[in-house]
């Protein structure tokens, strides 16, 4: 009995230690803002975007439902005769010539479909690529087929549900410009508790010739709630910045280096909670701040990542 209790205590300590190391703070492309007790930080952001509490989640595998798998197989123009692998970790399909491949991985919670890049030219243009106006419907139908609710999807760059884009190739032939669009695509990311997940769950799809899916990548884990914590108030967040417990996101090259010891002031214009997992199995919350930094030479828009909960508590 004593041995069992000891093992449980050790496990609890290991978990607590792990949670004090938010994977967001391990990002190599971020700059640690140095501690500075006299840093002038001004909060002008609405606080209604910050919930009263947030959760830490454990990322779990996703076996995907038989219905979802069947729909994806048909969507990617495969049949059971094209299956090349099936086991407890997932399944895989391949076209007879080996050019098209579909893999569904349960441990990584991922659906991945690839086709060769089309060899296009002025005499071999893409055919009947769906117009941009059709992409919302195509994307919505795609998500329904893999049992992803629209309520769990959001876009990037302050957009609604999806981000649509297209490549454009131009050929100059006999004094004539020929334009060609090889595909139109969509990107989306996942939300949990209405909070977006950064660089983890979400997906993208390419719609090419005749509206067929030419590429598909979806990552969609199952989640298990570990614990909840109250979020920090604005004054506590300001103190974290002064204590050097925040990261500066990269700035444009024309901005150059921000000399934080000489910064005149930081004005927080917007505060948004986000989730991040990195290379771990834990989904951890943090707070993204949109700020105006007065460097003494001008005002610079700077993104700052900081804790949204007291990470010193187990």
Task: Tell me what each language-model feature is.
Residues 166-209, 260-278, 286:
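Aromatic/basic-lined ligand-recognition segments
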Residues 1-4:
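Positively charged n-region of N-terminal signal peptides that target proteins for export
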Residues 21-183, 189-196, 219-227, 310-313:
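Preferential activation on post-signal-peptide N-terminal prodomains/segments
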């Amino acid at each position: 009995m004593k041995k069992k209790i000891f093992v449980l205590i050790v496990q609890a300590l290991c978990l607590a230690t792990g949670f004090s190391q938010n994977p967001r703070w391990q990002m190599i492309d971020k700059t640690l803002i140095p501690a500075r007790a006299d840093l002038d930080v001004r909060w002008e952001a609405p606080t209604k975007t910050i919930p009263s509490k947030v959760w830490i989640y454990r990322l779990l595998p996703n076996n995907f439902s038989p219905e979802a798998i069947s729909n994806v197989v048909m969507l990617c123009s495969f049949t059971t005769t094209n299956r090349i692998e099936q086991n407890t970790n997932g399944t895989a399909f391949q076209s007879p010539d080996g050019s098209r491949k579909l893999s569904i991985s349960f441990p990584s919670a991922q659906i991945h479909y690839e086709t060769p890049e089309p060899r296009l030219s002025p005499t071999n243009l893409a055919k009947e690529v769906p117009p941009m106006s059709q992409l919302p419907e195509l994307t919505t139908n795609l998500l329904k087929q893999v049992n992803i609710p629209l309520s769990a999807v959001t876009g990037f760059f302050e957009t609604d549900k999806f981000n649509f884009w297209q490549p454009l190739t131009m050929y100059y032939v006999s004094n004539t410009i020929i334009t060609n669009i090889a595909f139109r695509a969509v990107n989306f990311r996942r939300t949990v508790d209405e909070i977006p997940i950064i660089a983890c769950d979400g997906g993208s799809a390419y719609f090419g010739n005749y509206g067929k899916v030419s590429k598909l990548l979806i990552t969609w884990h199952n989640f298990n709630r570990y614990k909840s914590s109250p979020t920090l108030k604005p004054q506590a967040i300001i103190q974290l910045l002064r204590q050097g417990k925040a990261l500066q996101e990269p700035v444009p090259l024309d901005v150059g280096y921000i000399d934080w010891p000489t910064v005149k002031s930081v004005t927080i214009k917007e505060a948004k909670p986000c989730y991040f997992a990195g290379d771990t199995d834990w989904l951890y919350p943090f707070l993204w701040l949109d700020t105006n930094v007065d460097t003494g030479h001008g005002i610079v828009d700077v993104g700052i990542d900081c804790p949204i909960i007291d990470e010193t508590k187990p």
